[in-house]
C-alpha cells in the first residue's frame, strides 16, 4: 500500500493488514474470548503499537457511542481511557471487565427485555445518515438494531480489554463494521 492509497483508503481492515505486515505481526483475526486479566503490575501496554491500537479501539467506541447505551459499558470505556493515561491501576480495568462483559451477555441473552426494547427503539430512531457515519461504508443495508446493539456491546468489551488479549490480531469479523479508516488515520500514520 502506498501513502496515497493509505490516504484514500476507506477500509480500516486493509489498512490494519498493511500495518501488521509492515510490523511483521500476524494479522489473523483474533477470537474474542472472555476472562482476560491484566497483570497487577502492568500500567501500560507492551508497545507503542499496542497503545495506539487500544486508543483506536476506544475511539471507535466513542464514535459508536449511541450504540452503547448500557451504563456499565460506558463506564468501562472511560476506565480504559483513564488506564491508558496512567490514572487508574490495572485492577480497575480488570474490575470493570466483569460488568462490561455482563452488559454484553445481558443484551445477547435478552435478560432485561423492557430495557433492551427501549435501546432497540433508540437505535431504530437514529437517522440513516447518522448510522451510516458510524458504520463501515461496505454496509449498504441498515443492519438489524438488535444485532447491531449486541455486536457493539461485544466490540466495546473487546476494545476495553484489548491490552490483556494474547495473541493480538485483527478484530473478529463481526466487529469490522465499526472500524473507521478516517479514525485509524487519526491514530496511526502511514509507514512504509
Locate predicted features.
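Structured binding/interaction patches within domain cores
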Residues: 1-192
Amino acid at each position: 500500500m502506498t501513502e496515497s492509497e493509505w490516504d484514500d483508503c476507506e477500509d480500516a481492515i486493509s489498512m490494519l493488514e498493511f500495518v501488521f505486515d509492515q510490523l511483521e505481526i500476524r494479522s489473523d483475526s483474533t477470537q474474542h474470548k472472555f476472562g482476560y486479566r491484566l497483570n497487577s503490575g502492568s500500567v501500560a501496554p507492551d508497545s507503542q503499537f499496542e497503545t495506539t491500537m487500544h486508543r483506536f479501539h476506544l475511539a471507535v467506541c466513542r464514535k459508536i457511542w449511541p450504540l452503547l447505551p448500557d451504563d456499565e459499558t460506558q463506564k468501562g470505556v472511560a476506565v480504559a481511557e483513564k488506564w491508558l493515561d496512567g490514572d487508574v491501576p490495572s485492577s480497575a480495568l480488570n474490575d470493570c471487565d466483569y460488568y462490561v462483559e455482563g452488559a454484553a451477555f445481558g443484551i445477547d441473552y435478552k435478560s432485561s427485555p423492557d430495557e433492551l426494547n427501549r435501546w432497540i427503539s433508540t437505535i431504530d430512531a437514529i437517522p440513516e445518515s447518522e448510522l451510516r457515519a458510524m458504520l463501515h461504508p461496505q454496509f449498504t443495508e441498515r443492519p438489524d438494531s438488535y444485532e447491531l446493539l449486541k455486536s457493539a456491546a461485544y466490540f466495546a468489551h473487546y476494545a476495553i480489554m484489548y491490552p490483556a488479549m494474547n495473541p493480538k490480531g485483527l478484530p473478529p469479523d463481526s466487529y469490522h463494521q465499526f472500524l473507521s479508516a478516517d479514525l485509524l488515520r487519526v491514530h496511526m500514520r502511514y509507514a512504509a
